[in-house]
Regions:
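Short, charged/polar, Gly/Pro-enriched secondary-structure boundary elements
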Residues: 1-5
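P-loop NTPase catalytic phosphate-binding loop
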Residues: 7-138, 156, 161-228, 232-246, ...
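Short glycine-rich substrate-engagement loop in P-loop NTPases that contacts/grips substrate
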Residues: 137-148
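Charged, low-hydrophobicity low-complexity segments
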Residues: 143-144, 154-156
Length: 264
């Protein structure tokens, strides 16, 4: 049975959700819609062999956020080494996509530019921490609440902070071409950025140890596994077997940190 995106978005659970960044992931075995909150995750790691629905899952996540959020509330940074997967999103460039001032393309396909983007995200992260420190709050949610109630002075550099969602479509490809240069900022962002509203979503085909290193893995408690080719791959991503026995085509295991939930 095909689970249509429409049925998830139309579900009461999604329509009435009070989550900060709701994501419609799929339906459970008991046919209930599963809606997760990206801010609670705080970062998401997806893996699966070719043609098992990774890109579809990625699109589902992006569509959920675009549907529920105003462009002032969330911005995306899309990194797409495959060049074609995320190009449909350049239509919303002026609204939803964040980019470096000197770039022409909003969706980064060139691996050499990725390092610049990641480093500038680190800078943005540090700048946001400074603002939080001045506002004497702990999280971006409290900060924006305070700002909306006019308790912070814009002349001192305070501004409404949108969430930033960084999506990397083929992580293995980046590691092959740039290696440590990419890994270090990604690990830094993963460790520190959740309080200032920067969230990572990483998709990769081969969940091998040299791609998903220990540091990265430690900071991604939430994981989604589509069908993978071997039990070893399944263990690498979920720390448990089972992803090698999925049917494929959108059949996935979602692990929000402690349990395994099977979704379609």
């Amino acid at each position: 049975e095909i689970v249509a995106m429409k049925s998830l978005i139309a579900s009461d659970k999604f329509q009435n959700s009070k989550m900060e960044l709701p994501i419609a992931l799929g339906k459970t075995i008991s046919n209930e819609s599963l809606i997760a909150d990206l801010t609670k995750m705080p970062h998401l790691l997806m893996a699966g062999a070719t043609g098992q629905g990774k890109s579809v899952g990625l699109n589902a996540i992006l569509v959920s956020l675009i549907y529920k959020k105003h462009p002032s509330q969330v911005k995306f940074v899309l990194i797409d080494p495959k060049k074609v997967e995320l190009t449909i999103y350049n239509k919303i460039e002026r609204h939803f996509l964040a980019k470096l001032p000197d770039e022409e393309e909003a969706i980064i396909t060139d691996t050499t530019k990725v390092v610049n983007t990641l480093n500038s995200l680190c800078v943005e992260m540090e700048a946001r921490y400074e603002l939080l420190k001045e506002a004497m709050v702990r999280t971006i949610k409290e900060y924006n609440h305070k700002f909306v109630q006019r308790k912070l002075n814009p002349e001192k550099g305070h501004k409404y902070m949108p969430y930033i969602v960084l999506v990397i479509d083929e992580f293995a490809d980046l590691i092959m071409t740039a290696g440590k240069e990419v890994e270090t900022p990604v690990a830094r962002i993963a460790q520190l950025a959740r309080a200032v509203g920067i969230h990572l979503i990483i998709a990769t085909q081969r969940p091998s140890v040299n791609v998903i290193t220990g540091t990265i893995k430690a900071n991604f408690p939430a994981r989604i596994a589509f069908r993978v080719s071997s039990k070893i791959d399944s263990r690498t991503i979920l720390d448990a077997g089972g992803a090698d026995q999925l049917i494929g085509r959108g059949d996935m295991l979602f692990s929000p940190g402690n349990e395994l939930i099977r979704l379609q």
